[in-house]
């Protein structure tokens, strides 16, 4: 009996690990596709892209999960970011610090939102919206842009501030416009398709 219970527990743990791995892989793939499209389609002068919604999936993914589970998704996204920059951006060497800046931006925004109080990812009031805009739309892209614009300026011989302004605007607007819907979907408040929940039930978000 004890062996059966132990085996069942191990199977459950394996399912959780596989689930986490699959979700992380999907995050990395989605980031790579969005980032690649942004670089190819909205990078007009060889500098920073003018539209950047790619950070939003990472931000939303981290914001609804405990910080102790962030390392895997951050590493996977960093690899995806480096690959996109290497293939379609300003090269593999510049892609290393750019991926650090982008992943740090998503993590910082999510950390501020999680530390801001009681479940601010639900957007149930003006305070949660204000903290979200402050974290993901102002502080995180402004700070990440310092490194990002510096790397771009160094490798393209362009001016720093125009690239910082383009980075800040693109990352801020991209995350603000996309992340709220992603957060609601991840929390189960928006259903994909026609499936409906019975009245009186609440969706619970797994943190794995």
Identify the meaning behind each predicted range.
Residues 2-50, 55-158, 178-208:
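Short helix-perturbing small/polar motifs within transmembrane alpha-helices
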Residues 132, 161-174:
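Short aromatic-rich membrane-water interface segments that cap or initiate transmembrane helices
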């Amino acid at each position: 009996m004890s062996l059966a219970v132990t085996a069942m527990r191990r199977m459950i743990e394996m399912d959780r690990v596989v689930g986490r791995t699959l979700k992380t892989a999907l995050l990395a793939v989605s980031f790579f596709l969005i980032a690649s499209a942004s670089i190819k389609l909205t990078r007009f002068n060889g500098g920073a892209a003018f539209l950047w919604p790619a950070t939003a999936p990472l931000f939303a993914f981290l914001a609804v999960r405990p910080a102790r589970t962030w390392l895997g998704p951050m590493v996977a996204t960093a690899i995806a970011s480096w690959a996109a920059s290497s293939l379609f951006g300003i090269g593999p060497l510049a892609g290393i610090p750019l991926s650090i800046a982008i992943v740090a931006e998503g993590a910082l925004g999510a950390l501020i939102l999680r530390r801001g109080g009681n479940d601010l990812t639900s957007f149930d009031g003006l305070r949660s919206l204000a903290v979200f805009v402050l974290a993901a739309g102002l502080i995180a892209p402004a700070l990440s842009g310092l490194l990002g614009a510096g790397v771009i300026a160094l490798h393209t011989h362009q001016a720093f501030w125009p690239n910082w302004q383009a980075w800040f605007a693109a990352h801020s607007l991209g995350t603000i416009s996309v992340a709220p819907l992603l957060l609601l979907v991840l929390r189960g408040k928006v259903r994909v398709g026609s499936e409906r929940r019975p009245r009186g039930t609440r969706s619970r978000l797994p943190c794995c």
